[in-house]
C-alpha cells in the first residue's frame, strides 16, 4: 500500500529526515532504523531533493547517533522514565529504546496527523498535537 503525503514548509522536513535515516540503514549502515525503512517503503513521495542534499543527510545521521546514545544512556540510569519527544516529526526512536514507562510524541497538528497514519499510537506510545 502506498501512502500519498502532501506537505510543505516545516512539516515537510520530517519526510527528509526519515528518508535520510532509511537511506543510511539501507546503504552505509552507520545507524539502523528499520522503522524508517518501513515508512519510506510505504510512501508515495518524490525524495529526489533529499538525495541531492548530502550535508542534510550527514547532519541527520550525526544527530541520530548522538541522540540515540544520550537517550539510551539516560533510560539505562532512570528505569521507567516518561519521555516527552518534542517536535518529534517521524522520529522512530520510541520503537527501539527500552526502559521507559511511557513515550509522548509531541508536534504540530499536521505532523501528528501524518504520524497517526504511518505510526499509530500503541501501548505506551502516545501522540499529542
What are these regions (language model features)?
Residues 1-128:
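Rossmann-like AdoMet
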